[in-house]
UniProtKB/Swiss-Prot annotation:
InterPro entries (UniProt xref): Ribosomal_uL16, Ribosomal_uL16_bact-type, Ribosomal_uL16_CS, Ribosomal_uL16_dom, Ribosomal_uL16_sf
Function: Binds 23S rRNA and is also seen to make contacts with the A and possibly P site tRNAs.
GO cellular component: cytosolic large ribosomal subunit
Protein name: Large ribosomal subunit protein uL16
Assembly description: Part of the 50S ribosomal subunit.
Annotated gene: rplP
Protein's GO biological process: translation
GO MF annotation list: rRNA binding; structural constituent of ribosome; tRNA binding
Length: 138
């Protein structure tokens, strides 16, 4: 599971996920990409589940890049605990996703295979996505 190894602070404020992605919006490494159309949070488990679905489908061929990293801790208090007494302990890690963010990239496979692999991966994710192809000269 993906999570940071060294942290300056263990817990963060909730914040608001607004705006659109300005960085990490183009296909940079592979030939095909899975781009976020909606906004939301991807947990480390969801990122891994989608990666596994793609890897199983393309079998031995191709290479996959994960372009997002879950660097935000989400805390949770235990069940039936009274309010107050500080912030809960870290439960899991998420990546905040804005529209336009490239989630995964792939190369070394045909477009049909990549399209199907990304379709299987998108089924594991809670946000709307689209398939993109690298533009010539990009």
């Amino acid at each position: 599971m993906l999570q940071p190894t060294r942290l300056k602070y263990r817990k963060v404020h909730k914040g608001r996920n607004t705006g659109i992605a300005t960085r990490g919006t183009k296909v940079s490494f592979g030939d095909f990409g899975l781009k976020a159309v909606g906004r939301g949070r991807l947990t480390a488990r969801q990122i891994e589940a989608a990666r596994r679905a793609m890897t199983r489908h393309i079998k031995r061929g191709g290479r996959i890049w994960i372009r997002v990293f879950p660097d935000k801790p989400i805390t949770k208090k235990p069940a039936e605990v009274r309010m107050g007494n500080g912030k809960g302990s870290v439960e899991y890690w998420v990546a905040e996703i804005q529209p336009g963010k490239m989630l995964y990239e792939m190369e070394g496979v045909s477009e049909e295979l990549a399209r199907e692999a990304f379709r299987l991966a998108a089924a594991k994710l809670p946000i709307a996505t689209t398939f993109v192809v690298r533009q010539v000269g990009q």
